């Protein structure tokens, strides 16, 4: 009986460790490793969700952003359909932008696609396409 309980506890512990390690924080990575990881995640996301927008016209542009600080009252007013619904004030995210080549094709938004990725979990949470369509990945 004790061994069965011990095995179950060990399994649960390993499950928590595996889940935690899969959500890698980009904060601790060196600059070049972080950028290559962001580009890889963005390409995988586009390949899965919008493969026709995985057009590489030069190197992707990476920019770092922070969710603005909100008062508790302002947080309650964020609509559920918002891309940033549930985000914490000050939470850091990256935008990986795939630039357009206007000599080949021109998009309304001025880029082919943008993938939004959280810094703390390395998870993509939104895609903005060059035709002005936004896809939430929640």
Question: What are the residue ranges of the model-derived segments?
Answer:
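Exposed beta-strand-loop-beta-strand "reactive/processing" segments of non-cytosolic proteins
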Residues: 63-119
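A short, surface-exposed interaction/processing loop segment used at functional sites
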Residues: 107-138
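Bacterial Sec-dependent N-terminal signal peptides
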Residues: 1-26
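Short, non-transmembrane alpha-helical segments in secretory-pathway proteins
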Residues: 25-82
């Amino acid at each position: 009986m004790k061994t069965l309980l011990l095995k179950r506890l060990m399994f649960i512990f390993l499950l928590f460790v595996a889940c935690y390690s899969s959500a890698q924080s980009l904060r601790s990575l060196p600059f070049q490793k972080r950028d290559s990881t962001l580009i890889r995640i963005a390409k995988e996301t586009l390949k899965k969700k919008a493969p026709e927008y995985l057009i590489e016209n030069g190197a992707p542009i990476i920019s770092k952003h922070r969710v603005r600080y909100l008062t508790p009252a302002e947080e309650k007013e964020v609509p559920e359909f918002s891309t940033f619904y549930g985000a914490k004030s000050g939470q850091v995210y990256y935008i990986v932008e795939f630039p357009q080549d206007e000599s080949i094709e021109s998009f309304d938004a001025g880029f082919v696609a943008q993938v939004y990725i959280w810094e703390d979990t390395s998870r993509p949470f939104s895609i903005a396409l060059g035709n002005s369509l936004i896809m939430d990945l929640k």
